[in-house]
Amino acid sequence: MQERAPPSFPPSRTKAMVPVLPRLYVSGADLGPADDSGKPAVTALLQVDSEPPGAAALAGFESTLFVQALDRPQSDLLSRLDDCAAFLSQVLEGGGSALVRCHAGVSRSVAIVTAYLMKTNHLTFQEAYAFVQAIKPDAKMNEGFEWQLQLYEKMGCKVDVNSTIYKQYRLKNITENCPEIEGLPGHVFAIDPNTVHQILNHDTLYRCRKCRRLLFRSSSILPHDEGKGPAAFAHKKVSEPGPLSHAGQTNCTSYFIEPVQWMEAALLGVLEGQLLCPKCTSKLGSFHWHGEQCSCGHWVTPAFQVHKNRVDEVKRLGKHLGQFLGKM
């Protein structure tokens, strides 16, 4: 597909705020909304920082959005990119002007503006980032933010919480930021298929081979490429969480899946352990938050591994499962 050229706007020599697009600026935290004459130059502020800005820092802005994030590779910006884009679009389409601000004005704010250009101008990550750097030569987001924006591009510049890409990202993010693995948020766990009576027609169910208890859906499987040995953490390997297919995994003897609700009690507070059927307690596999190696050689982090010889497939049951569940 032919690549689109970045929008053409001349770079600015303004020191206080750097205009990335007409009425869209980026700066460091010590710069406010006033121009050289002391009059407000922008109407809205998007602040990215470790702590919310004080009242003095918000003075002069009609609307504000705060995104809490440290400038480190493990910080989560990806989940907030759509919120930021919606905020900026609303301001600019309404005739206002916006300032995207972080402490130094070179990493977090640059990542937000780059994502906005990707989404609104249909640019690749490389195109949008190069455009910002041409205007602001000191722009340099950390490698974790670069990786997150590349994931954003793979999702079509839309955060899809149901995509394999986002599920893998979310689990890796938990591993890096929560070493003790306590108090996991509920949205991390997939719905237990044994507690619902409807599924999508394209979903395949997997049940315990011994007691036939439903365990997980095909949409919970997190596929991977065949590989060798432990890989570095995800933000150093952009290709790991990409959109993968189940094809090419014939050498895998296990399914690697997202956590399911019935696993919650076993996972909290421990880094590794066995996965047992919640009905008959037969061993299904194992989990390790710091990763396990698949039989194909690929290192999966974190790993929730169910052995294929311990489960059976139940294909295309249709919309209603009440009759099926009633027989279990």
Kindly label every feature range from the protein language model.
Residues 2-9, 82-97, 114-272, 288, ...:
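PTP/DSP superfamily signal
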Residues 13-54:
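Glycine-rich, flexible N-terminal cofactor/catalytic loop recognition
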Residues 32, 40, 50-56, 62-94:
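Short polar/charged helix/loop
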Residues 106-112:
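Glycine-rich nucleophile elbow surrounding the catalytic serine of serine-hydrolase chemistry
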Residues 107, 216, 285, 299-302:
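Short functional micro-motifs and their immediate structural scaffolds
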Residues 208-211, 277-280, 293-296:
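Short cysteine-rich clusters marking metal-coordination/redox-active sites
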Residues 267-283:
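Cys/His-rich Zn2+-binding "zinc-finger" mini-domains, especially FYVE domains
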Residues 286-293:
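Conserved tryptophan-centered aromatic signature that marks the ligand-binding surface of SH3
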